[in-house]
C-alpha cells in the first residue's frame, strides 16, 4: 500500500490529506466551519453535516491537484469512523466508501483518538515506543500508555467534563466567542494570576482520572460574586486556565512515575494551548524527560493523521466491506494491534 487518501469529518472540520509511504505527506487541506457555528455559540450537528456534504468533494479534488495526482494514483482510502457526531461521520464514511468502490481500492475506518496519537509520526522528530500520551481533544481527556501502534492502555480519563469542554463552557459563561478555548486563553493572558485561586481537582487522589466540571462551577460563582467587568473576566480566565494546566501536568508527572516511562506526548486540540506547552516544557527540563507535540495544524482535527493511521492499518491487512457503518462511541480498547 503506497498512497492513501484520508478523510476527516468527525465534528466541525472537513479535512482531507494524501499520505505516501515513501514520500510522506503529499497534501492536506482543512476547511473549518467556525463561521457557521459561531452565531450559535457551539457546533450544531445538522449544520455540520450539511456543510461537510458541500465541502468534501471539492477538498479532495484540491488535495489531488496540490499533489499533482489523479484517482489512478490512490491505493487506498481511510476515513474517520468514530467517535464523533453521527451525521458528520456518515458523510465522511459515505464519500470514502463510494470512492473506494468506484476506484476499486480498499477502504478502512480509523479511530479519531488513535489518529491523534499517530499525528506525531508525521513530524521529523518522533517519539520512540513506548510513551505516555496526554490526549486532550474535544470531549476527551485521557492519559494513554502507548506500547506500540494499536496497543493502548488507558491510565486515566475524564469522569465528567473533558478539559476542552470545560474551556468552551467557561468561555461561553464569560461571553467569549466560539471557539471558546482559544478565546479564553487569549483573555487569560491579560489576567492577574494571584487574584483568584481555583482548586486543582482530584490531584490528591492516587488515580489518574480527571474532573473539570467543578472548575466551571467555580468560575460561575466568581462571576456572580464579582461581576463581569473586563479585568475580572480576564482574572477568572487566568485562574481557570492555570488550574486546568496545573491539573494536567500533575497527572502527567504521576503517569510517568507510575509507569517508569520518561517520554511524554501531548496531542489533540488543547495541545495547541500555549501555556500548557510552555509549562510542560519547563517541567520536562527539570525532570530530564522527553516531551513531544505536533505542530499546531496537526493538534486540531486534520486529514493527515487519518491518512497516516489508515496507511498503517491498510498495510497491516485491514479493510472493510461496502456497508456504511460509523461508531459515534468507540472505545480504543476495541482496536486491533498493528503488526
UniProtKB/Swiss-Prot annotation:
Enzyme Commission identifier(s)? 2.3.1.234
> How does the cofactor attach, per the note?
Binds 1 Fe(2+) ion per subunit.
Q: What family does the Swiss-Prot or TrEMBL record give for this protein? A: Belongs to the KAE1 / TsaD family.
| The protein's name | tRNA N6-adenosine threonylcarbamoyltransferase
Q: Does the keyword Repressor apply?
A: no
Q: Is the Lyase keyword given for this protein?
A: no
Q: What is the enzyme's main class?
A: transferase
What gene is behind this protein? tsaD
Required cofactor(s): Fe(2+)
Function description: Required for the formation of a threonylcarbamoyl group on adenosine at position 37 (t(6)A37) in tRNAs that read codons beginning with adenine. Is involved in the transfer of the threonylcarbamoyl moiety of threonylcarbamoyl-AMP (TC-AMP) to the N6 group of A37, together with TsaE and TsaB. TsaD likely plays a direct catalytic role in this reaction.
What keywords sit in the KW lines? Acyltransferase, Cytoplasm, Iron, Metal-binding, Transferase, tRNA processing
Amino acid at each position: 500500500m503506497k498512497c492513501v487518501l484520508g478523510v476527516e469529518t468527525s465534528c466541525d472540520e472537513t479535512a482531507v490529506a494524501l499520505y505516501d509511504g515513501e514520500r510522506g505527506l503529499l497534501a492536506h487541506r482543512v476547511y473549518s466551519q467556525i463561521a457557521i457555528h459561531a452565531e450559535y455559540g457551539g457546533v450544531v450537528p445538522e449544520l455540520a453535516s450539511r456543510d461537510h456534504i458541500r465541502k468534501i468533494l471539492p477538498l479532495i479534488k484540491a488535495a489531488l491537484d496540490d499533489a499533482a495526482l489523479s484517482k489512478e494514483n490512490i491505493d487506498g482510502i481511510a476515513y474517520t469512523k468514530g467517535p464523533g457526531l453521527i451525521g458528520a461521520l456518515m458523510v465522511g464514511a459515505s464519500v470514502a466508501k463510494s470512492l473506494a468502490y468506484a476506484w476499486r481500492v480498499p477502504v478502512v475506518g480509523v479511530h479519531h483518538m488513535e489518529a491523534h496519537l499517530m499525528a506525531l509520526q508525521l513530524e521529523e522528530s518522533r517519539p520512540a515506543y513506548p510513551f505516555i500520551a496526554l490526549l486532550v481533544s474535544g470531549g476527551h481527556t485521557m492519559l494513554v500508555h502507548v506500547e506500540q501502534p494499536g496497543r493502548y492502555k488507558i491510565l486515566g480519563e475524564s469522569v465528567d467534563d473533558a478539559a476542552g469542554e470545560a474551556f468552551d463552557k467557561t468561555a461561553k459563561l464569560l461571553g467569549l466567542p466560539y471557539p471558546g478555548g482559544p478565546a479564553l486563553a487569549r483573555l487569560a493572558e491579560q489576567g492577574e494570576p494571584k487574584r483568584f485561586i481555583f482548586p486543582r481537582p482530584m490531584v490528591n487522589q492516587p488515580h489518574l482520572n480527571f474532573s473539570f466540571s467543578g472548575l466551571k462551577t467555580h468560575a460561575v460563582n466568581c462571576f456572580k460574586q464579582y461581576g463581569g467587568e473586563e479585568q475580572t473576566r480576564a482574572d477568572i480566565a487566568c485562574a481557570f486556565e492555570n488550574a486546568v494546566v496545573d491539573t494536567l501536568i500533575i497527572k502527567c508527572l504521576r503517569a510517568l512515575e507510575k509507569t517508569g516511562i520518561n517520554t511524554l506526548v501531548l496531542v489533540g486540540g488543547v495541545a495547541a494551548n500555549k501555556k500548557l506547552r510552555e509549562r510542560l516544557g519547563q517541567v520536562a527540563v527539570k525532570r530530564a524527560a522527553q516531551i513531544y507535540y505536533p505542530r499546531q495544524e496537526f493538534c486540531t482535527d486534520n486529514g493527515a493523521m487519518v491518512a497516516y493511521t489508515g496507511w498503517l492499518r491498510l498495510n497491516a491487512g485491514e479493510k472493510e466491506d461496502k456497508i456504511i457503518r460509523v461508531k459515534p462511541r468507540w472505545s480504543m480498547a476495541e482496536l486491533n494491534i498493528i503488526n
